[in-house]
A protein has these predicted regions:
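Transmembrane beta-strands of outer-membrane beta-barrel proteins
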Residues: 31-35, 72, 86-88, 132-134, ...
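Transmembrane beta-strands of outer-membrane beta-barrel pores
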Residues: 37-41, 90-96, 127, 136-142, ...
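Signature of Gram-negative outer-membrane beta-barrel scaffolds
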Residues: 1-79, 97, 200
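Short loop/turn motifs that connect adjacent beta-strands in outer-membrane beta-barrel proteins
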Residues: 28, 83, 129-131, 181-182, ...
Length: 347
């Protein structure tokens, strides 16, 4: 109370140098290279809004970090015919922690920058009425900042560095336009998102007869090849679009598979799969005076009143012995069927 903890001083200096080159190896085969160098100087000085009960004071914020990143990207494009294209690329992406990563982290072990090695190979096809594509990717992470399932004091999601993890999968897309007034677009991603070696920290407690609580030693549990939190294996998006003489209609559908809410892959701490549909209807007309165009419409969200949660928090601990494990979760339930109207004017 009566302490302006938010008046800490922060300064971030970000410098970038880019170099880009393209080269035609043949009339149908080309290569490219994008090079980026980044230098970041990041300082935070002051106190945090978190209280250190051992020192009887607000936690200090003393961040003085410098980052130097070299992020190259190289690739090949092969235009086999005017309709068919193959491509391949390799890139490095490095990213510094955000301010929240520092303020929510442990001052004795501030978060590290994450590094990604990205490998991609893909194919696309396009003609006037059909587009299709497939993209295969493998993303190899060092110190990836992943969600933990926990929240800070104001409800923001917390993250932690994971030394060795990966995301791999295939992205598929299809677009069909058989006539002027109808189009069908669909895309899907199947992925495998894993932590190779995860060490779970499980706090323990003993509940005394006088209703006080005694903290027990934190137990470290090793896990192999666990799901990354909030990373579904399957995403599917579908859209039907109609457009005829000023009338527009579209039906958007999304399927999301089961998600784990922590990185320990606990079956009790998951978000169930869900399938949600939104319907949009609109009509556009052109008045003869003043306005060039008027659009009237409405959107019905969650058309079939699906009961689902798309976010939440989760944690675990033990009482007296590790075998007496407790798992806890909170869920962000989403709205049922709801309607939003809209009007737009063009002068």
């Amino acid at each position: 109370p009566e302490h302006e903890y938010y008046r800490n001083k922060s300064k971030k200096t970000d410098g970038n140098i880019y170099l880009k080159a393209n080269y035609d190896l043949t009339s149908t085969l080309s290569a490219y290279a994008d090079l980026q160098y980044r230098h970041i100087d990041y300082t935070i000085d002051g106190v945090n809004d978190k209280y250190d009960w051992n020192k009887n004071a607000l936690r200090p914020l003393a961040v003085d970090k410098k980052f130097d990143f070299f992020n190259p990207k190289v690739g090949l494009n092969w235009n086999i015919t005017p309709n068919h294209r193959l491509y391949a690329s390799f890139s490095v992406a490095q990213k510094e922690p955000t301010r929240n990563n520092y303020t929510d982290g442990d001052p004795d072990s501030y978060p590290k920058a994450e590094k990604l090695l990205d490998y991609e190979v893909g194919y696309t096809f396009a003609n006037p009425w059909l587009t299709a594509g497939a993209n295969f990717y493998y993303m190899d992470y060092t110190d990836q900042l992943v969600l933990t399932g926990a929240l800070n004091d104001i409800g923001e999601a917390l993250t932690e560095n994971i030394p060795d993890s990966y995301r791999m999968g295939i992205e598929l897309m299809l677009g069909i336009k058989p006539c002027k007034w109808f189009q069908w677009d669909i895309n899907a991603t199947w992925s495998k998102n894993r932590i190779k070696d995860f060490v779970e920290s499980l706090p323990g407690y003993h509940y005394n007869a006088d209703e006080t609580v005694t903290s027990l030693p934190t137990v470290l549990i090793k896990h192999k090849d666990t799901h990354i939190a909030f990373s579904p294996d399957l995403l599917l998006n579908n859209r039907f679009s109609f457009n005829y003489k000023g009338f527009e209609a579209s039906l958007q559908s999304q399927f999301v598979s089961k998600q784990y809410m922590t990185n320990a892959e606990v079956e009790e701490l998951t978000l169930d799969k869900y399938f949600v549909n939104n319907l949009n209807l609109a009509y556009t007309f052109r008045p003869k005076k003043i306005l060039k165009e008027v659009t009237l419409g409405f959107t019905v969200y969650n058309l079939f009143n699906e009961e689902y949660e798309n976010n939440g928090w989760a944690s675990s601990d033990y009482t007296d012995t590790v075998e007496n494990r407790g798992n806890y979760a909170g869920y962000a339930a989403q709205a049922g069927t709801n309607v939003l109207g809209h009007v737009s004017f063009r002068f």
